[in-house]
Amino acid sequence: MNDRDFMRYSRQILLDDIALDGQQKLLDSQVLIIGLGGLGTPAALYLAGAGVGTLVLADDDDVHLSNLQRQILFTTEDIDRPKSQVSQQRLTQLNPDIQLTALQQRLTGEALKDAVARADVVLDCTDNMATRQEINAACVALNTPLITASAVGFGGQLMVLTPPWEQGCYRCLWPDNQEPERNCRTAGVVGPVVGVMGTLQALEAIKLLSGIETPAGELRLFDGKSSQWRSLALRRASGCPVCGGSNADPV
């Protein structure tokens, strides 16, 4: 860590829970962010600002006018430009001292597994069930911690899932690929709510990477109308085809 790093990250380094050792861990880490929408853009901003050494930014979509209500990395001038490339450009302006890789593709199959294998933490910021399930399966197979979130209306949810998966995985809670009846396309979403959830994904990633204990194995639910939180304990499903031990299928 050089003098420039010390000055840039000085407000984090002052924290006993992070200090120089924790900051160096962040600088040496790689985070894969899949989905650069309402969740992924605030998460990416805070992780870049915090000095995570390598951010891999994956999204196959372009910026649309309807995104601008909540996807805070983008401006009107970015409409029809690839989200991954715009994100890389904006984050470089924020922190030119980190490595930023743009993947303008929908990660799936071997490409997904390769990206997960190189990451220290994966942030699932996607918006469809099939993709979430595939990300979860890859993370479990490769023992990569997964931080997943979603938001619709005034509500959000967050999970931190870590090896050895004693509290289960995403499929334990949602055992099939059926899409929820309500999503932001059909029911809408309040921008700050999805921002809260994406920011918390960044916070949990910083904690994991710097060695701060974090409560894993909980489904945390946020009600934006009442500003209330509640947590539900997760339990591994004995017959889970992803994390269920001898019952698990190979990925």
From Swiss-Prot:
One of its GO terms (molecular function) is AMPylase activity. The keyword Lipid biosynthesis does not apply. Pathway: Cofactor biosynthesis; thiamine diphosphate biosynthesis. Zn(2+) binds at residues 169, 172, 240, 243. One of its GO terms (cellular component) is adenylyltransferase complex. Binds 1 zinc ion per subunit. There is a cross-link at residue 184 (Glycyl cysteine dithioester (Cys-Gly) (interchain with G-Cter in ThiS)). ATP binds at residues 11, 38, 59, 70, 83, 107, 127-131. It holds the Pfam family ThiF. Its cofactor is Zn(2+). Its EC number is 2.7.7.73. It catalyses: [ThiS sulfur-carrier protein]-C-terminal Gly-Gly + ATP + H(+) = [ThiS sulfur-carrier protein]-C-terminal Gly-Gly-AMP + diphosphate. The active site is at 184 (glycyl persulfide ester intermediate). Keywords: ATP-binding, Metal-binding, Nucleotide-binding, Nucleotidyltransferase, Thiamine biosynthesis, Thioester bond, Transferase, Zinc. One of its GO terms (biological process) is thiazole biosynthetic process. Homodimer. Catalyzes the adenylation by ATP of the carboxyl group of the C-terminal glycine of sulfur carrier protein ThiS. Belongs to the HesA/MoeB/ThiF family. This is Sulfur carrier protein ThiS adenylyltransferase. It comes from Escherichia coli (strain K12). The lineage of its organism: Bacteria, Pseudomonadati, Pseudomonadota, Gammaproteobacteria, Enterobacterales. The gene is thiF.
